[in-house]
Amino acid sequence: MAASSTNARLTNPPRLLSKPRLSPTSVANLRFPAADFSTRFFADSSSPRLRSVPFPVVFSDQRRRRSMEPSNVYVASNSTEMEIGSHDIVKNPSLICAPVMADSIDKMVIETSKAHELGADLVEIRLDWLKDFNPLEDLKTIIKKSPLPTLFTYRPKWEGGQYEGDENERRDVLRLAMELGADYIDVELQVASEFIKSIDGKKPGKFKVIVSSHNYQNTPSVEDLDGLVARIQQTGADIVKIATTAVDIADVARMFHITSKAQVPTIGLVMGERGLMSRILCSKFGGYLTFGTLDSSKVSAPGQPTIKDLLDLYNFRRIGPDTKVYGIIGKPVSHSKSPIVHNQAFKSVDFNGVYVHLLVDNLVSFLQAYSSSDFAGFSCTIPHKEAALQCCDEVDPLAKSIGAVNTILRRKSDGKLLGYNTDCIGSISAIEDGLRSSGDPSSVPSSSSPLASKTVVVIGAGGAGKALAYGAKEKGAKVVIANRTYERALELAEAIGGKALSLTDLDNYHPEDGMVLANTTSMGMQPNVEETPISKDALKHYALVFDAVYTPRITRLLREAEESGAITVSGSEMFVRQAYEQFEIFTGLPAPKELYWQIMSKY
């Protein structure tokens, strides 16, 4: 289904969940009436889904094979619908290759040892980075001293590398590397046929030729990628390597299609932040290897993660064909700590899942591209929370009442998307705990919420703003919505029975002292850390200030609020609470709450 914008909606409206989630910490304390919505949201048995077109998948490299459960991964590429997956699949666990880029062989030797210590499986020696290069001596040195298998790449300028010298000399160096004991060499498709013919009958038994193609503009259609694979195979390549560029995260689905059905070992990577998933999930979708850098400052291609992140953040060695994929959908999204907490939590309970960053421009096209049971659940952040509600087949009454979804679960039985909102309990409980810990006399009696009768000023009318506003209203607070666009503030205020303000009027709004201020916008988030939605002078009228931003932990708003004498509540408090609610939705297991708090205490 085509979609022209982030807010594009699916044809069928969501219905209320027949069995709403009953969390002892959330729904029991936040009962919003759903009756008002029953006339507008109705059950519909149909839902847009991509049809499947099966084809066999075979992996020829039998080293370290392991069984893969039958799976169907639906992906979309241009106008073509396809299915990744088949029965009786076997696959090769993916390797981690560390690019070594230095201007001298001595530095390269040091970096190969570092790669070994960090946990890489092999190193890519980028010869085109060397300044003073003595081929015979330098190749002998690196092959002898590297503690890991070596892949030699001498990338020319015309394929995105540094080398600008004679082409025949370049190929001679690669042949010499083979003769001296290299494990792999990388040769560009443009010259591969001629090169491979020149070494015919001379290849050592263990030696492999990787034939590579790099596209720095986009990711072609599946038909074009299939044709590219065929051309690479025709050269006599032992291993196929294709690297493309992600214009949209849905482009990665086409690369998963290629690696999943490969007849020979294939490296398929999509460059850029939108392509990060291709590098993390290659073990799941049949990729021969992925690249992990020694540190984040030195990458050989855009979007490469570090070896440390692959192993420690994403638990790369635990990812296999049957691993379920979860992720944080947003734009921006790289700042999110969700992968850190969820992946550690998954590992702590031995849950076979991986949680990744998902930079999504268009939510509808993303959900269509990744509509199989392999992609089991998502967290939604700015700007997709409201659109997410319309993309779900069924929605929890709380999320329906709020008008925003921050958690999506794919139901195992039928693949339908179920929408929830954990922002509400996360933010409200954080603010309540802040008020209770202050000993504020207005917080009694203890049997009621400390928000009762408080004036709560909510900055922002998006998904998080809606969740907090509804939660505060249910707790008996007087809610005021302040937003840059007054019309949006008014719309939310009318929906909950509150008041509306333009954000420009916030500094002059102080009908009483002891109010609660809650920022639910991205103002003050990295990298714009000096932004704040309100003047410091106006903060003296607030007893408590909450900021949903948690990167950085202490924003300018919180710093100035503390200096003004207010209680401050960090977005980390909300983040942890909503995150372990999400964990329970994703896994059906009790959340390791102490672990979540322990992890976030470091940030």
From Swiss-Prot:
Region (3-dehydroquinate dehydratase): 96-313
Biological process per Gene Ontology, one example term: chorismate biosynthetic process
Signal peptide location: none
Binding site for 3-dehydroshikimate: 124, 126, 155, 241, 279, 300, 304
Effect of residue 385 to A: Strongly reduced shikimate dehydrogenase activity, but minor change in substrate affinity
Consequence of changing residue 336 to A: 13-fold decrease in substrate affinity but almost no change in activity
Spans annotated as Disordered: 1-22
Protein name (Swiss-Prot/TrEMBL): Bifunctional 3-dehydroquinate dehydratase/shikimate dehydrogenase, chloroplastic
GO cellular component, one term: chloroplast stroma
Transit peptide start and end: 1-66
Compositional bias (Polar residues): 1-10
Keywords: Amino-acid biosynthesis, Aromatic amino acid biosynthesis, Chloroplast, Lyase, Multifunctional enzyme, NADP, Oxidoreductase, Plastid, Transit peptide
Record carries keyword Hydrolase: no
GO terms for MF: 3-dehydroquinate dehydratase activity; NADP binding; shikimate 3-dehydrogenase (NADP+) activity
Matches recorded under CDD domains: DHQase_I, NAD_bind_Shikimate_DH
Chain sites annotated for binding shikimate: 336, 338, 381, 385, 406, 423, 550, 578, 582
Pathway annotation: Metabolic intermediate biosynthesis; chorismate biosynthesis; chorismate from D-erythrose 4-phosphate and phosphoenolpyruvate: step 3/7; Metabolic intermediate biosynthesis; chorismate biosynthesis; chorismate from D-erythrose 4-phosphate and phosphoenolpyruvate: step 4/7
Assembly and interaction partners: Monomer.
Domain of life: Eukaryota
Region (Shikimate dehydrogenase): 328-558
Organism for this UniProt entry: Arabidopsis thaliana (Mouse-ear cress)
